[in-house]
Amino acid sequence: RGFGRISGGERQLVLVARALVQNAKILIMDEPTANLDYGNQYRVMAKIKELAAGGYTIILSTHNPEHALLFADKSFVIQKGEFVAAGSSAEVLNEEMMRRLYGVDVRILTTEINEEEARVFVPVGTSARDK
């Protein structure tokens, strides 16, 4: 099928594949998992992590803080066009930052996956600013 006849998620996968085929050692990706279903989001992010481990420099934007927690070493937070924070994803993406960015109270759950610590956010309610 032609590019114009495939779904939005399939188009996004094609765009990611095109970036990889170019063999650039630095990849800048604007929301590479946009329009992808849950499984394909994971596949794309896992491939990005694999590329980073193989020596690629990856810069990507995401509105999914869990992607940054699970797949990124470092995070830079921008809110309303202003630089807010930078550092390791585990340090920067915390409960207070989620409240500040999204107006949602969260708890961070930690587990071990493949002998590595993995952290995920669980929303528990909206913050006082929304009440």
Model-found features: residue ranges?
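ABC ATPase C-loop
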Residues: 19-20
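Catalytic Walker B motif of ABC-type/P-loop ATPase nucleotide-binding domains
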Residues: 27-30
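Helix N-cap at the start of a conserved alpha-helix in ABC-type nucleotide-binding domains
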Residues: 38-40
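Helical segment within the ABC ATPase nucleotide-binding domain
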Residues: 42-54
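H-loop/switch region of ABC-family ATPase nucleotide-binding domains
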Residues: 62-63
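A short, surface-exposed alpha-helical micro-motif characterized by mixed small hydrophobic
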Residues: 68-70
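H-loop (His-switch) and adjacent beta-strand-loop-beta switch element
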Residues: 75-88
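ABC ATPase nucleotide-binding domains
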Residues: 101-131
